[in-house]
Amino acid sequence: MSKSLDADVRRLLDAPNFAALSTLMPDGSPKVEPIWVGREGDHILIATDRRGVKGKNLELDKRVALSITDFGNPYEQALIRGRVIETRDDNELVILDRLSHQYLSKPFPRRKWSTRVVYVVEADVARYYKSPLEHTPA
């Protein structure tokens, strides 16, 4: 059952905030890594190399979990559980360049790819949380 993303979750996805992506390894153990994320409507976009561990994991098991933390306030976050519903080739780096502009303000610098893909994720659960705590490290 897909979940519409509320305005706060969309805002965190649309800003240059890193997400922690959790996928499942072939043996069932979790793998977590920081990634860039994009959005199309209520879908989350994950750009990667199909041959990498992340791509291989997503080909084997479509389930994902994402934690997106606000870059300026680590006590503001979105938590998403969902699944890959579509895989798109992105060898021309159209989506990756869009994400790169979001995070680096320029096209993606490494241009030689032959197995770039974008995984389109549909959220089954999407929650937004903002703590009243203030981030004031010593």
Please give the residue ranges for each predicted region.
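Extreme N-terminal tail/first-helix region
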Residues: M1-F18, A138
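Charged, gly/pro-rich active-site loop segments
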Residues: S2-S4, Y75-A138
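Short beta-strand segments
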Residues: P16-R50, L58, V64-I68, L79-I80
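A short beta-turn/loop motif at secondary-structure boundaries
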Residues: D27-S29, D70-P74, K112-W113
